[in-house]
Structures are given as structure tokens and as C-alpha cells.
Amino acid sequence: MAFLMHLLVCVFGMGSWVTINGLWVELPLLVMELPEGWYLPSYLTVVIQLANIGPLLVTLLHHFRPSCLSEVPIIFTLLGVGTVTCIIFAFLWNMTSWVLDGHHSIAFLVLTFFLALVDCTSSVTFLPFMSRLPTYYLTTFFVGEGLSGLLPALVALAQGSGLTTCVNVTEISDSVPSPVPTRETDIAQGVPRALVSALPGMEAPLSHLESRYLPAHFSPLVFFLLLSIMMACCLVAFFVLQRQPRCWEASVEDLLNDQVTLHSIRPREENDLGPAGTVDSSQGQGYLEEKAAPCCPAHLAFIYTLVAFVNALTNGMLPSVQTYSCLSYGPVAYHLAATLSIVANPLASLVSMFLPNRSLLFLGVLSVLGTCFGGYNMAMAVMSPCPLLQGHWGGEVLIVASWVLFSGCLSYVKVMLGVVLRDLSRSALLWCGAAVQLGSLLGALLMFPLVNVLRLFSSADFCNLHCPA
């Protein structure tokens, strides 16, 4: 029974951000098909931030009309909308419309808004729902949330999305007549070498290497259908969770009085969740921990500020510059950093399950350590296309390790802060979700002008780099 509950909670948590994470990992294929090209990530950033209207409305309703807000029907609606939108996405993602003297992916952007609305609102609905379950299930939820990034990345890896190769490109004068390809052709242009060399008065063609994306193993249609299956699994998992006995909704900590012996059970209070039910003491005692939940306003302010800061780094600022910081070291280093940093998220959640530490001092120090790794990643992005140790194996190892440790440290902090707030109240988890979205919004708004307006970062073509020794 316990394994089933952990599995259901994990699948439920996976549905929190699986669709938007899927869009990001599919971008290398989408930018080649849609008219926005490489401006598409900028459009996605704006659309996703506009979707924060969802969590804003939920938070305001909770504050002004708490009695009329129930997260269960909202979650069912979100998961249903997300599943249907993914299915529609699979068939309309490449549909364009003529707007303002040009073709634009209006259907893509509108559907992206609905997917982002689902994922953003999940932060202020999924977490409060988890207050109905014992605390140890919250860690499993964060493991599932980490898998929401890992599973789409693995599907994209199997698809071949984002894989590049170096292609030899030959440039010749416009006056050269259109050649007919023969067996002696250049790799990219199909220009016969014999024909070019035979033309009088012509200079030798110039050749250079460029990065080109490899063809995908299956289309975006299949990818989005797989995303819809993941969302449907999340919907089914939540439905089954609702069908479990009500005794699972009562946290063991809510049933036991800290001031009496472990086997003394206090009477149920009016604000306890669900009717009284039997709880297996052997299971409950194994997860019982000494509470260290801070109650003073200064501690709460520190926790919510740290939640917003950590999510600003992990969701808003650093993802915007990952390609700039890694691609200069080559495609292998980039794919290792991108994949392993995603894997580090659920692994850090698992570590927090077996090695929990609720000390705010420890979490603060770990946040500083993760921020230092993030600072190194940001510095390498600013120095692109010629960062430190470019062309040396040590630089590749450092950038991959830095991204993995950045993701792992801050993921652990996020999980433990959620556990601390869960022990306070359901409202604390809702405000935790609001802080998550606020931090992500501020991070994205800060990076958008730096990347797209001021253009402080320069992209690197690893196949054609000219850096000083």
C-alpha cells in the first residue's frame, strides 16, 4: 500500500511541469519549422510569464474568499485541460497565420499559454493538496516534479532533438553558374571541385565548418502525443489518490502530541483533515522527525525569500544562459550538462528523503554554495564564445560538474523548505507556491532584456571557433 501511494504521488508530481519542460527540450526542432525561428524562446518566455495570472487569481481567492476555494476540482480541471491541450498541440503546432505583414505561429502561442496556465497554477494547487498527506509523501512529490523535466529530456534524446554535427560548407562567387552535382562534390553545397577549378579568373572556393542539426528520429507530433500520455497518467494518478481511504490524508504528525509519549494519541481537533482513522504505527514512527518549524515572522520571511531566490535562479535566470555557458565547450559537454543537471533534480529529492536537514542555517549555506556554482555558470556564459579553459578537457569537466552541483544543491534546498512549510499549515504551502512563481517571474523578467535587448551574451558555434590560445 505504501509503495502504491508513493508511486501515485510521484506520477501526480510529474504532471506539474512536464508540458512546459517538454516544449523547452523540443525547441531545437521547433525553431527550424516555425517562422519565429530563434526568436521563439523569447516568445515562449513572455507567454509563460503571462500565464502567472492563474496562480495570482488562486492566491487572491485564497486570501479574500478562502472558504470558496477547493483545490481538488481545480486540479481535475487543470489536468484535463493539460491533457486535451497536448493532444490538440500535436496536430496544430506548425499551423501559421498571417498577422502584421508576416506569418506567425498564433496557434502554437495560444496553446502554449494554456499549457503554461496549467503548469504555473499547479504550484499553488498541487502543494496545498499535498498537505492532506503525511509529510514524507511531500518529498516523493518533489521527486516526481524533478521527473517532469527528466522524462521529456529522455524522450527528446531518443528523438535526437538538439543533436548537431559539423558540416563542411563551401562558399563560391555568385558569378559561378549553378553546378550539377557529381561524385566529386563538397559536403554541403554540391559544387564539383573540377568545375570550380576550371573556371578562369576565379579564386579558390572558401570552406569552413558550421553546426547543423541532425534529422530527428520521429516528428514533434509523436513527441506531443507522448506528452499527452504523461499528462493523462497524472490525471489517472490523481483520481486514484482521491479514491484512497481517508485515513491516508491525516498526517502522522497531526495525530501525535509532541509533549507526550509516542504512543499517546490526542483527540482529533476540528481542523484536522479527514475523519479519524487507524494509522500503522510501524510506518508512522519510521518517518517521524523532530519538528523544527520556525514560527516567528523573521524566520518565515527568510524562508519565503529563500524560496523565491532559489527559484529565480533555477527557473528564470540560469536556464536562459545554459547554451551560452556550455556550447563553447562542445556538443558533448553541452548535452552532458543539460541532461545530468536535470537528473540531479530528482536525485537531490531522493537524498532529502533519506538525509533530511531542516536547519535554516544549513539550508542558507547550501543556497550560497549553489549560488556560487550558478555564478560560475553565468560567468562562463558572459565570456562566451571563449570562456575559461575552452578547448581543454578540464574546462568541460568543470562546466558539467558546476551545472550538476548547482541543480543538486538548490533542488535539495527547495525540497527541504517545502517540508518545513508543510509542517506549518496548508496556507504556508500555498504561499510557498506563490513564492515559487514570483521568483521564477522575477528571474525571467531580469534575464529577458539582458539576453534579447542588450544582447550581453554571444552564441558559440563550436565547429567554427577562433579563440586566442
Curated annotation (Swiss-Prot):
Outcome of swapping P220H: In BVVLS1; uncertain significance
Effect listed in the UniProt record for changing E71K: In BVVLS1; loss of localization to cell membrane; loss of riboflavin transport; does not affect protein abundance
Effect of R132W: In BVVLS1; loss of localization to cell membrane; loss of riboflavin transport; does not affect protein abundance
Membrane topology: Multi-pass membrane protein
Positions of glycan attachment: N94, N168
Alphabetical list of Pfam families matching this protein: SLC52_ribofla_tr (PF06237)
Residue numbers on the Cytoplasmic membrane side: 1-2, 65-71, 119-137, 242-292, 357-359, 418-427
Tissue specificity annotation: Predominantly expressed in testis. Highly expressed in small intestine and prostate.
Intervals, Extracellular compartment: 24-43, 93-97, 159-220, 314-335, 381-396, 449-469
Transmembrane helix is among the record's keywords: yes
Biological processes, Gene Ontology terms: cellular response to heat; flavin adenine dinucleotide biosynthetic process; riboflavin metabolic process; riboflavin transport; sensory perception of sound
Subcellular location: Apical cell membrane; Cell membrane
Record's catalysed reaction(s): riboflavin(in) = riboflavin(out)
Cystine crosslinks: C386-C463
Listed GO MF terms: riboflavin transmembrane transporter activity
PANTHER family: SOLUTE CARRIER FAMILY 52 (PTHR12929), SOLUTE CARRIER FAMILY 52, RIBOFLAVIN TRANSPORTER, MEMBER 3 (PTHR12929:SF4)
Disease with which this protein is associated in UniProt: Brown-Vialetto-Van Laere syndrome 1: A rare neurologic disorder characterized by sensorineural hearing loss and a variety of cranial nerve palsies, which develop over a relatively short period of time in a previously healthy individual. Sensorineural hearing loss may precede the neurological signs. The course is invariably progressive, but the rate of decline is variable within and between families. Fazio-Londe disease: A rare neurological disease characterized by progressive weakness of the muscles innervated by cranial nerves of the lower brain stem. It may present in childhood with severe neurological deterioration with hypotonia, respiratory insufficiency leading to premature death, or later in life with bulbar weakness which progresses to involve motor neurons throughout the neuroaxis. Clinical manifestations include dysarthria, dysphagia, facial weakness, tongue weakness, and fasciculations of the tongue and facial muscles.
Family in the record: Belongs to the riboflavin transporter family.
Full protein name: Solute carrier family 52, riboflavin transporter, member 3
Annotated organism of origin: Homo sapiens
Gene of this entry: SLC52A3
